[in-house]
Amino acid sequence: MSEEELTNGPGPEPQPEPLEVESAPLEAAPAGEPDKALLEAQQQASENWDRFVRAQAEMENLRRRLEKDIQNAHKYALEKFAKELLPVMDSLELGIAASTGDAPDVAKLREGAELTLKQFKSVFEKFGIAVVDPLGEKFNPEQHQAMAMEPAGEAEPNTVVKVFQKGYLLNDRLLRPALVVVAQA
């Protein structure tokens, strides 16, 4: 090291020499031809926008589907419970139908069963459970299950002439079909 470097510190650092880049003068694109890079960028932007719009639409559709699924889950949550109550309702109705005596004890029993049945029907209505009792109606395979066919007699062909067991709907969804006898032609 030289004495000057020791007293003054190292000398000024050498500056890098500027690089000389040969640049061609920018040529203006001919008036009739658009810049290829600009067209590609616009096309890419258009494709990206299209993807974005499709993704937004897909998300909105998914949100709507999920909302509908949640609504249906709430609406039909009672389905299993309601199906379990149907035999209880049937038994009450049969018990009332069987209690035809005039004895005071039978009358009290019948009255209690009728009040219980009335409460059941009220609860069913409250929760959207409707009775399907198609006696005299046209046979509907979506709500009725034909157990037998009988000669028509006075009834019109393909109408329900007897109901073995009532059917039930939960918010217009079939819980149990009505078991019926249908008039033959």
From Swiss-Prot:
TM helices/strands, residue ranges: none
InterPro entries, sorted: GrpE, GrpE_coiled_coil, GrpE_head
Main subcellular localisation: cytoplasm
Subcellular location: Cytoplasm
Disulfide cysteine pairs (residue numbers): none
Top-rank taxon, per record: Bacteria
Keyword line: Chaperone, Cytoplasm, Stress response
GO cellular component, one term: cytosol
GO biological process: protein folding
Region (Disordered): 1-44
MF terms (GO), sorted A to Z: adenyl-nucleotide exchange factor activity; protein homodimerization activity; protein-folding chaperone binding; unfolded protein binding
Homology family: Belongs to the GrpE family.
Role this protein plays: Participates actively in the response to hyperosmotic and heat shock by preventing the aggregation of stress-denatured proteins, in association with DnaK and GrpE. It is the nucleotide exchange factor for DnaK and may function as a thermosensor. Unfolded proteins bind initially to DnaJ; upon interaction with the DnaJ-bound protein, DnaK hydrolyzes its bound ATP, resulting in the formation of a stable complex. GrpE releases ADP from DnaK; ATP binding to DnaK triggers the release of the substrate protein, thus completing the reaction cycle.
Record text on subunit structure and interactions: Homodimer.
The protein's name: Protein GrpE
Species assigned in the record: Methylococcus capsulatus (strain ATCC 33009 / NCIMB 11132 / Bath)
